[in-house]
Amino acid sequence: MDVKLSEIITVSSLVKKYDNKFLALNALNLNINQGEIIALLGPNGAGKTTLISTICGLTSITSGKIEVNGFDVIKDYRKTREIIGLVPQELALEPFEKVINSVRFSRRLFGKKDDNKYLDQLLIKLQLFDKKDNIIKSLSGGMKRRVMIAKALSHNPSILFLDEPTAVVDVELRKEM
């Protein structure tokens, strides 16, 4: 029996041209089905981060259309962001905040109520539970990357984008992730 998976991301004729006229994405079409795991591979400047940023609604598009779970990323921005978790390339953390407070804050940004059990389990899986009351500034680079992953998963999204997720993460944890 042939099982058809539902499309969760649809990118149609996507064009992204930056102000300096650099063409980052040219008439890109892409369909991603629910449950699929994909990797974007290519050299620096190939448009991988630009594609992720446009799907997440963080970068404007020049033309084309992007839908996430049937919602337009421009018209239904909040709806699509609730569905997506994003771990960006750059570490963007509050250096003087405790790990748990930073993760909890990210969850609240999506209108989710506190769920200490869920957040504790998340921190356990990412080997951060014993660091949850530590100030982020005191963590290693790999631990900071894992805090970013915890923040991205804090609101329990259906879709997770990892832009360079294993940068500065030690080899053993990379295997587990």
Kindly give the residue locations of the regions a language model identified.
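Walker A (P-loop) phosphate-binding loop of ABC-type ATPase nucleotide-binding domains
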Residues: 43-47
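Conserved ABC transporter NBD signature motif
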Residues: 64-72, 79-80
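Conserved ABC ATPase "signature" region
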Residues: 104, 108-131
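Conserved ABC ATPase signature
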Residues: 135-139
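Conserved catalytic motifs of ABC-family nucleotide-binding domains
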Residues: 156
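Catalytic Walker B motif of ABC-type/P-loop ATPase nucleotide-binding domains
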Residues: 160-163
